Regions:
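Conserved class I S-adenosyl-L-methionine
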Residues: 43-72
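A short glycine-rich, Lys/Arg-flanked "PGG" loop and its adjoining helix->strand segment in the class I
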Residues: 28-43
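Short conserved loop adjoining the S-adenosyl-L-methionine
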Residues: 3-10
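A conserved beta-strand element that flanks and buttresses the S-adenosyl-L-methionine
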Residues: 16
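Core SAM-dependent methyltransferase catalytic element
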Residues: 95-96, 107-137
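Short alpha-helix
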Residues: 75-104
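Short aromatic-enriched loop/helix-cap "lid" or pocket-rim segments at secondary-structure transitions
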Residues: 12, 56-60, 113-114
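A short His-aromatic
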Residues: 19-23
Length: 137
């Protein structure tokens, strides 16, 4: 299931995208749209579980792969550090974001067997608008 962000005509000083990128079918398109929602000095706060293991939720609890793949450097990263660096240099910067801060934070998910709680690593990125996007639409 995909929902589009409505065109509001407004921009915002702060936009958050918390644990959504790995669950959406078009993560690059979502990031482009979120960038459009920022004021020139606005901040985008992105949290994503790493290493990158996307699973788009479908009806009846089924999952599928995203229709839009992130670069190989992100998909192949095995550690938190590799994943965070790959997201910064292969995704956020080419989309026209400056990475201001990265932090490792715990994320508790009910994604384990039988709904058990699993402790994961979230990469929390503080992004601002930088140079124009170099990734084709």
């Amino acid at each position: 299931m995909q929902a589009e962000l409505p065109a509001t005509g407004f921009t915002h000083d702060l936009v958050t995208c918390l644990n959504v990128l790995d669950r959406t079918s078009r993560p690059l398109a979502l990031l482009r749209r979120l960038r459009e929602l920022l004021t020139p000095s606005g901040v985008l706060l992105v949290a994503v579980v790493v290493p990158w293991r996307p699973a788009v939720l479908q009806r009846a609890g089924l999952t599928s792969a995203p229709s839009e793949a992130l670069p190989a450097a992100v998909r192949e990263a095995a550690t938190f550090e590799q994943s965070a660096a790959a997201l910064a240099t292969s995704v956020f910067e080419p989309l026209g974001f400056d990475v201001r801060r990265v932090s490792r934070v715990p994320y508790l998910s009910r994604g384990g067997p039988r709904g058990s709680i699993v402790a994961l690593d979230d990469a929390l990125f503080v992004l601002t608008k930088g140079a124009t996007s170099t990734v084709p639409k």
